[in-house]
Every structure is written in structure tokens, then in C-alpha cells.
Amino acid sequence: MLSPLLRADHGPLSPGRRFVRRLRAADALLLAEIARRRREPDLENRTDVLSLLLRAVDDDGRPMTDAELRDELFTMLGAGHETTATGLAFAFDLLLHNPETLARLRSEIEHGDDDAYLEAVVKETLRLRPVIDAAERTLTKPRVVAGWELPAGVKVYPALALVQMREDLYPHAREFRPERFLDDQAESYAWLPFGGGIRRCLGAALALAEMAEVLRVAIPARELHPVRDQPDPVVLRNVTLAPRRGVEVEVSRVRQPQSRPLTPVS
């Protein structure tokens, strides 16, 4: 997060001037895409995030303005950049310190029929190493929580990371076990790396897809080994959790991945 002093425009060579210039360039790209998408004849049939936002209306039937759409897209892309990269760092750290899981993932990517195990690895990573450990919410009506009376309007911060470490929900919760997600038995409010409810993270689907795709490409293509004996400790950086020293990986050689055979399209 940039300091207000750095965001301010102090002249042509200042960081603030570069920030404003790049922000305007990003705005132009996003607004052009919004305008182009509004003209698409098949908008009603599209299921991507932007199309869903374009069709969304509030309680009074009003759609989102271009400025509101731009802000949502910028939030999704900008806020998701660091968080997704951090989630991937956690994934590599956990996989490299669990060689049997790494070997199974590589085999499933190369020979499996679907992405079930790959998706389970991503979900288990974000359960054991969530990038965001709390989500602010404002109570719309009074609540009693553990004997405490909380009036409407109070801000609460559910400890998402603690929920995901409950032994009654996740047996052997401190262990990295992706197979626990293969049966998709996790309760809706027991897996919360993106929050929950109507204010769940807008970029959740994009982040999951990005993490899966990076692992799909990187794992079969390289022989990877951990540099340290144990996974890196987790620390709080600004509002996100991250590996304390970063995740260092040793690449011993390039592999020739055995690609999963393509399924003919009829």
C-alpha cells in the first residue's frame, strides 16, 4: 500500500506522477473493455465475471455504472496479484516438504483424467495457509456471540484461519492432506480463505484458476527440491499472511513432462 505522500503528484519525475499516469492507463484499458463487452450480442449467455457484473442490478433494478464496474475489476485484478502469488508460494512450500503429495500431484497432472487432485491441493493449501486470516463484517442486527451482546452497526472480525484449523471440522488439521477435499465434504462455512456470504471475495474463482494453472505447468516441467528443512514460518505483512523469508526452491533439472492425452472432441 502506497503512502499518500508517494501517491501525490510532485512533478514529472515523482513517483506520484508515474502512479497517476499508470492508473489512467489502467482505467482506459478497463473502460474500453467494459464498453466493448456491453456491445456484445451474446452478453446474456456469458458466464465470465465481467458479464455477470454487467447483468447485475441492485434492489431498485439499477445496473452498475462504468465507474463501479471499473472499480470492481481493478480490485479483483489488483488485490489478487499479491495474494495469489503468496498463495502459490505457500503451495510450493507445502508440496516440497511433502514429497509423496508432490509425486501424486505430478502423476495426476500427467496421467489423471481430471483436475480433482490439483484442485484439492489448492484448496488444502489455502486451508492450512490462508493469505487473509480475517474478514471485516458490520452487523445489520444485534447478535449474541459466546455470551457477548453485540448491537447492530458493530464491526466484527471472524477469525477465518482458526475455523479452518478446527479438529472437529478437519481431522489432523495441522497436516497437509489434500485428499480431504476429494469428496467435497467441507461445509460451506468451514473453508473460508475468501470469506463468505454475498461479500465473498470477487476474485475467488480467478485466484483458484490461476493457482491451479501455475502448478499444472510448473510441477511436471521441473525437478524441485526444498532449500530449507521445514516450511517457512508465517508472518503478517500489512493485511496478508506470507512466508517469513520467502520460499526458496532448488531446481535440479528440466523434465520432459508426459502430457495427459487430449480427448477428441466429437
List the predicted regions and their residue ranges.
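Cytochrome P450 catalytic core segment centered on helix I
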Residues: M1-D59, V265
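Proline-centered turn/helix-capping motifs that create local helix->coil transitions or kinks
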Residues: M1-S3, E33-R46, R62, R129-A134, ...
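Cytochrome P450 catalytic-core helices
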Residues: H81-E108, A204-R222
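Conserved cytochrome P450 K-helix E-x-x-R motif and the immediately C-terminal K′/meander segment
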Residues: A28, G112-A146, E167
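Conserved cytochrome P450 K-helix/beta-meander segment immediately N-terminal to the heme-binding cysteine loop
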Residues: P142, P158-Q185
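Cytochrome P450 proximal C-terminal region
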Residues: E110-G112, R200, A205-S266
